[in-house]
UniProtKB/Swiss-Prot annotation:
Residues 1-56 are annotated as: Disordered. This is Pantothenate kinase 2. Subfamily II proteins have an EGMGR motif about 50 residues from the C-terminus. This motif lies near the metal-binding residues in the putative substrate-binding cleft 2. Subfamily II proteins occur only in eukaryotes, in two forms: as a stand-alone unit in plants, and as a C-terminal domain of pantothenate kinases in plants, animals, and chytrid fungi. It comes from Oryza sativa subsp. japonica (Rice). Pfam families: ARMT1-like_dom, Fumble. It catalyses: (R)-pantothenate + ATP = (R)-4'-phosphopantothenate + ADP + H(+); (R)-4'-phosphopantothenate + H2O = (R)-pantothenate + phosphate; (R)-4'-phosphopantetheine + H2O = (R)-pantetheine + phosphate; (R)-4'-phosphopantetheine sulfonate + H2O = (R)-pantetheine sulfonate + phosphate. Pathway: Cofactor biosynthesis; coenzyme A biosynthesis; CoA from (R)-pantothenate: step 1/5. Its EC number is 2.7.1.33, 3.1.3.-. Catalyzes the phosphorylation of pantothenate the first step in CoA biosynthesis. May play a role in the physiological regulation of the intracellular CoA concentration. Functionally redudant with PANK1. The phosphatase activity shows preference for normal or oxidatively damaged intermediates of 4'-phosphopantetheine, which provides strong indirect evidence that the phosphatase activity pre-empts damage in the CoA pathway. Hydrolyzing excess 4'-phosphopantetheine could constitute a directed overflow mechanism to prevent its oxidation to the S-sulfonate, sulfonate, or other forms. In the N-terminal section; belongs to the type II pantothenate kinase family. In the C-terminal section; belongs to the damage-control phosphatase family. Phosphopantetheine phosphatase II subfamily. InterPro entries: ARMT-1-like_metal-bd_sf, ARMT1-like_metal-bd, At2g17340_3_helix_bundle, ATPase_NBD, PanK_long, Type_II_PanK.
Amino acid sequence: MAANNNSDPILDEGGGGGVKHEAVGEAGEGKGGGGGAAATQAPAAMLPRSGSRPQLDLSGAAIHGNLEDRNPTILLPNQSDDISHLALDIGGSLIKLVYFSRHAEHSSEDKRKLSTKRRLGMLNGGRRSYPVLGGRLHFVKFETGKLNECLDFISSKQLHRGGVDSPSWRSGAQPDNIVIKATGGGAFKYADLFKERLGVSLEKEDEMDCLVAGANFLLKSIRHEAFTHMDGQKEYVQIDQNDLFPFLLVNVGSGVSIIKVDGHGKFQRVSGTNVGGGTYWGLGRLMTKCKSFDELLELSQRGDNSTIDMLVGDIYGGLDYSKIGLSASTIASSFGKTISDDKELSDYRPEDISLSLLRMISYNIGQISYLNALRYGLKRIFFGGFFIRGHAYTMDTISFAVNFWSKGEAKAMFLRHEGFLGALGAFMSYEKHGLDDLRIHHLVERFPMGAPYVGGKIHGPPLGDLNEKISWMEKFVQKGTQITAPVPVGFPVTTGMGGFERPTAKGDILRSDASAALNVGVLHLVPTLDVFPLLEDPKMYEPNTIDLDLNEYKYWFKILSDHLPDLVDKAVASEGGTDDAKRRGDAFAHAFSAHLARLMEEPAAYGKFGLANLLELREECLREFQFVDAYVSIKQRENEASLAVLPDLLMELDSMNEEARLLALIEGVLAANIFDWGSRACVDLYHKGTIIEIYRMSRKKMQRPWRIDDFDMFKKRMLADKKGQPYKRALLFVDNSGADVVLGMIPLARELLRNGTEVVLVANSLPALNDVTANELPGIVAEAAKHCGILRKAAEAGGLIFDAMAGIQDDLKDEPVSVPLMVVENGCGSPCIDFRQVSSELAAAAKDADLLILEGMGRSLHTNLNARFKCDTLKLAMVKNQRLAEKLFNGNIYDCICKFEPVP
């Protein structure tokens, strides 16, 4: 048995973990239990959600502190101070915790941001007040047998008192009568112990109520939550929120409960069966002498059920029964072959018995579930419960049964967070955090490293601060042990990491469950994120241009791995090259390599992952190890070099007529986009010349027609009405620092301003590679404005410059008062952009925009090449990757894209 015998709780900085299970527990406590009796009963009455839950008292509510704080605290003077941030699901084998932590960072608004918000109409009564604090939802599991460790964890973080960052904890107040929501049989069994150790009372929540509430929340709020599992392949399913209900929720515990869910808080238990996980474990224990559920599943990984089950081929001489559509490998009778065999129980391999038993029970659960779905006209069936636990073969078997009996009309679906349904439902029963008001775009899931995960086992205690995390990683590296993945979710210790072949009647091969298990991250609640309002069809929008199949994964993993040493060097240098920085740099390299190894092992581990997600994962990993901006010194140097030659460029542009100038500007944007530290080919160029030499070389190579060349169409639109303004407001999504923004996008912005178009420069909220950020742009614009009256007046009008720059001479000082030039952040810290989650400032700026310009590979090629918007859109990029050029355009590296998409 390859289970993890470590008794420590596992957490992913509050994220999911895996532990060894010695008891089933949950099922016998109501969730999925008692199935047999219910199977013959009439459907239960509709169960309403409890009305006794405490409500949020909003009387006298006011924003506390800075009125313009990014994530404002709402002061509730009449609210009692017993707000809890913790809920539990206490089963027989596992305790599941869901807890909330506030964001530590609270950014203050400077004068520029306030000016921009005021101009965008975000301060004049249009401001939303958020009933939920910006923060994180964490998911943690403990063995129920190690309950004291769970209590120690709660106490150390003061979760029962709102956490160590809560006002009540900081004030030293000792609130009386603290109540924590809990579900599961252990909520009754261990109530006295919680009172004794923590001084809290457990308020018991109905288990089925919590299951349904948890499932509804996940399906509503997590984009890649539900997935199908057929032939060992996971496929995430995007569910239309308007078409979610009704569905069937099948909870497989010791027995099986089948629940028809009609809406939020509206459900009924319509059926069940007494043949469930307890049946599998009980019969399996009798026949194989296995001591635990996980050991029994371990055996099934190496089983061959054809030695025990009677197959259709056994009856028909190895042939299919094609007349009724049965293949030779179909099971005709579970355990049927043992009838004619002159063998005793001891003559059969325990592995084969376990697999045959697993198939028998899983097939029947799938069939009964589909028959209930058919009865109520439902096509969507979600399965959960301890019996599922991310076990690849169990999911495959249930999926096969549903597909077979429905003739392909229905699909079995599973949930990535399925082990936390009850705890989530209990957490939501507080109705104090506004979770019911959250939408899918408010939640961002991230995957920090937890404990080192090696050889299918999690080693070591929960990782606390960063130093402890690094120390643990160094320990494994010193031993020469490869850290192969961050902490996975659910039940990764069911088997080892050997990738056992699993012979079946069909000869199928599935991975061991340690590699097939999915991961649960930390859910970041960001109520200031919005859907970009100019998306033509938000429901159909897919940011990633290329799906990452196995070959694509291998290619990009090699690219990222090869780039890693250089990135570490720059990250360490950005922190002064100190010993501490070197230590963190090494830890980052090991952590990100572990992420790559995990995704190579199971591409679906973190949900549906495209290249944009992969690139953002790298940036998040850098931030996890406290590297704020790895390219900061490089960006500063390139900005200074580019600003030095900007006056000459502007003078050259001003000597041209309007048509020639527009072409030169677009050529300049494309040429300057060559400066990308994320491209290996471009990095090699940096070693062969200065930034200006490379820029001039790139300009000389600008020969039309480009690979995609819609310039003439764009020119016609720009010059169509010389007397009026062709566009009211343009949003320019900028890319790299240095020449890219200074010699490319700023001159283009200047031309739009000259024509009377408001310009909003949109940049990253957080650093990513050498991309310019929204915090850096005002300083760059201010320097550029010293040499240009158009830029200076527009920057003053847009609040980017507040002090008059008297004494600065230029040839354009008599230009008329300009329309504003503004800067907003996009809400992300990635080289790409997902328009399903952008900052509220960007969403507000988009209201009056009628032109979008997406610049750079990340924002217009890797993502959004095929995206359609409600206004005219220009996509500009130089292709700096040969494989991408071939795959997208049958082109070559350094090809240019000028794609104009006007609205009808």
